[in-house]
């Protein structure tokens, strides 16, 4: 199975970011998916790299490709479905990395 990871971009001044982060951590841990949390205030170059204009943002990657993205108001039910779909796609032999 190809690598699946989630990049969660947040800001220290974002209350919603801090409220959602524990739930994002819980779900990714349950699914066995790597999570990287990045503070865009401290690392604005990362926000630019991923074209992030608002936070929070959760980006799901399968291999090196972006598979799904949610920004601002993250629907946790949809996020869980996106992780399941990413796992299914990662198991497909013909899915490009």
Located regions from the model:
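Active-site loop signature of alpha/beta-hydrolase-fold enzymes
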Residues: 43, 55, 67
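Local sequence-structure signature of Cys/Sec-based thiol-disulfide redox active-site neighborhoods
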Residues: 1-26, 30
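CheY-like receiver
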Residues: 46-50, 82
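Conserved strand-loop elements at the edges of beta-sheets that form or border functional pockets
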Residues: 40, 52, 72
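Thiol-based oxidoreductase modules, predominantly thioredoxin-like and allied folds used
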Residues: 9, 32-46
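Non-catalytic, surface beta->alpha helical segment in thiol-disulfide oxidoreductase systems
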Residues: 61-94
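Short alpha-helical
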Residues: 15, 42-45, 74
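Structural micro-motif
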Residues: 50-59
């Amino acid at each position: 199975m190809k690598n699946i990871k989630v990049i969660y971009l947040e800001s220290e001044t974002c209350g919603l970011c801090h409220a959602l982060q524990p739930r994002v951590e819980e779900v990714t841990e349950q699914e066995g998916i790597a999570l990287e949390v990045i503070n865009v205030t401290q690392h604005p170059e990362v926000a630019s790299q991923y074209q992030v204009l608002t936070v929070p943002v959760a980006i799901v990657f399968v291999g090196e490709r972006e598979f799904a993205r949610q920004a601002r108001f993250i629907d946790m039910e949809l996020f869980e479905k996106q992780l399941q779909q990413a796992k299914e796609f990662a198991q497909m032999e013909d899915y490009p990395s």
